[in-house]
C-alpha cells in the first residue's frame, strides 16, 4: 500500500520513480521538496534538507513504517525549512505561481527598520 505524507513544502512517498511514475516500494522513500517552487534554493540549502531527511528516517530505524511516522518526518522537515528561511539561507521566490507567504511575511530591511525585528 502506498503511504504518503504531504505538507505545504514536503511530500514523502513510499515509492520510487520509474518512467516519471511513482511505483510503490517497501524499501524506498521518495522526497519532493518545495513542489510549488515557493522558495529560492541553492544547492547547499537543498542538501541540508536531504541530510535532515536522512537523519529523521534513520531515527525511525527499526520501527514500523506508518503514515503517522511519515507525517512526523514531514512536519519536522517543514520546521527545518522554516528555520532556513528565518536564517536567510533560502528566500521566497517572488516569481512563484502563487505568493502566499505560508511561513510568514518576508522581511525587508529599510533605514527605519534596520536592526529591529530580529528573531
UniProtKB/Swiss-Prot annotation:
Which superkingdom?
Answer: Bacteria
Pfam hit, one: NdhM
Where in or outside the cell it occurs: the entry states: Cellular thylakoid membrane
Q: Which GO terms describe its cellular component?
A: plasma membrane-derived thylakoid membrane
Report membrane topology.
Peripheral membrane protein
Q: Which keywords are on file for this protein?
A: Membrane, NAD, NADP, Plastoquinone, Quinone, Thylakoid, Translocase, Transport
The molecular function GO annotations come to:
oxidoreductase activity, acting on NAD(P)H, quinone or similar compound as acceptor; quinone binding
Which reactions is this enzyme annotated as catalysing? a plastoquinone + NADH + (n+1) H(+)(in) = a plastoquinol + NAD(+) + n H(+)(out); a plastoquinone + NADPH + (n+1) H(+)(in) = a plastoquinol + NADP(+) + n H(+)(out)
Enzyme Commission (EC) number: 7.1.1.-
> EC top class, in one word?
translocase
Q: What does this protein do?
A: NDH-1 shuttles electrons from an unknown electron donor, via FMN and iron-sulfur (Fe-S) centers, to quinones in the respiratory and/or the photosynthetic chain. The immediate electron acceptor for the enzyme in this species is believed to be plastoquinone. Couples the redox reaction to proton translocation, and thus conserves the redox energy in a proton gradient. Cyanobacterial NDH-1 also plays a role in inorganic carbon-concentration.
Q: How does it assemble?
A: NDH-1 can be composed of about 15 different subunits; different subcomplexes with different compositions have been identified which probably have different functions.
The family database entries (HAMAP family) matched by this protein are listed as: NDH1_NDH1M
Record-stated family: Belongs to the complex I NdhM subunit family.
Which protein are we looking at?
A: NAD(P)H-quinone oxidoreductase subunit M
* Species for this entry: Gloeothece citriformis (strain PCC 7424) (Cyanothece sp. (strain PCC 7424))
The encoding gene is ndhM
Amino acid at each position: 500500500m502506498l503511504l504518503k505524507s504531504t505538507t505545504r513544502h514536503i511530500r514523502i512517498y513510499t515509492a520510487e520513480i520509474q518512467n516519471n511514475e511513482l511505483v510503490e516500494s517497501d524499501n524506498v522513500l521518495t522526497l519532493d521538496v518545495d513542489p510549488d517552487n515557493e522558495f529560492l534554493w541553492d544547492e547547499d540549502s537543498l542538501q541540508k534538507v536531504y541530510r535532515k531527511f536522512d537523519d529523521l528516517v534513520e531515527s525511525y530505524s527499526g520501527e514500523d513504517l506508518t503514515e503517522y511516522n511519515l507525517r512526523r518526518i514531514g512536519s519536522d522537515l517543514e520546521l527545518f525549512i522554516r528555520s532556513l528561511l528565518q536564517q536567510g539561507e533560502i528566500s521566497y521566490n517572488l516569481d512563484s505561481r502563487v505568493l502566499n507567504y505560508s511561513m510568514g511575511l518576508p522581511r525587508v530591511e529599510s533605514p527605519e527598520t534596520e536592526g529591529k525585528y530580529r528573531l
